[in-house]
From Swiss-Prot:
It catalyses: Hydrolysis of (1->4)-beta-linkages between N-acetylmuramic acid and N-acetyl-D-glucosamine residues in a peptidoglycan and between N-acetyl-D-glucosamine residues in chitodextrins. Its main location: secreted. Optimum temperature is 38 degrees Celsius for the hydrolysis of p-nitrophenyl butyrate. Changing residue 117 to A: 83% loss of esterase activity. This is Putative peptidoglycan hydrolase Rv2525c. Keywords: Cell wall biogenesis/degradation, Glycosidase, Hydrolase, Secreted, Signal.
Length: 240
């Protein structure tokens, strides 16, 4: 049986103190760093972390979900970001980046192709605006998989084109592994890229990536499991 990293987070939320003993973060200095990193962002779904604790951990902001909790995702107490949280982060000088992911695995958003892209882009745009996100800021659409080229061409391309049709090319970000980022760049899809390492060559960072997720499920901040991301370009989709 395969267990995804999000299943691990779900287990951690249900069994506090069992997972992550000894990895509660007071500093992110031990996290891997991409060459040329301009700072660290956290991403998380299992709760809401006060700005003061994010700053104390050494991060400059957070990548936050503008998507609903999926069925069975009651543990995702941090989805979607709310206006009060966004005000806490921005009011304390922290950066916010919006990302969207509703389904996963067999229910992954991109599997629905073009029609799903329209649906999810509209919902992401609504939740982004409700949290105070400006109409100029991008939203990273998630390809949280290691897809084949056939899947990319037949489902991911129409999915991302639909995102662009709803929020615009300049506002469409892509969260994906390095090969999917490469395909998207070659096809002129997306303006911002956030790399994850599932299916990416070890130690490789795509030159087009604005952000790189370098650590998952290894630490907590404020009692919430976090992933660690390195900022690679001065403009990475931040809106606060």
């Amino acid at each position: 049986m395969s267990v995804s990293r999000r299943d691990v987070l779900k287990f951690a939320a249900a069994t506090p103190g069992v997972l992550g003993l000894g990895v509660v973060a007071s500093s992110l200095r031990a996290a891997p760093a991409s060459a040329g990193s301009l700072g660290t962002l956290l991403d998380y779904a299992a709760g809401v972390i006060p700005a003061s604790q994010i700053r104390a951990a050494g991060a400059v902001g957070a990548i936050r979900y503008v998507s609903d909790r999926r069925p069975g995702g009651a543990w995702m107490l941090g989805k979607p970001i709310q206006l009060s949280e966004a005000r806490d982060l921005s009011g304390n000088g922290l950066k916010i980046v919006s990302c969207y992911q509703y389904g996963k695995g067999s229910t992954a958003d991109w599997l629905g192709g073009a029609s799903a892209g329209v649906q999810h882009a509209r919902r992401g745009s609504e939740l982004h605006a409700a949290a105070g996100g400006p109409t100029s800021a991008p939203i990273y659409a998630s390809i949280d998989d290691n897809p084949s080229y056939e899947q990319y061409k037949n489902q991911i391309v129409p999915y991302l084109r639909s995102w662009e049709s709803v929020i615009g090319h300049q506002r469409t970000g892509v969260y994906a592994n390095s090969k999917t980022i490469d395909w998207a760049v070659n096809d002129g899809l997306g303006s911002y890229f956030w790399q994850h390492n599932w299916g990416s060559p070890k130690g490789y960072t795509h030159p087009a990536a604005h952000l790189h997720q370098v650590e998952i499920d290894k630490r907590k901040v404020g009692g919430v499991g976090v992933d660690v991301n390195q900022i690679l370009k001065p403009q990475f989709g931040q809106w606060a």
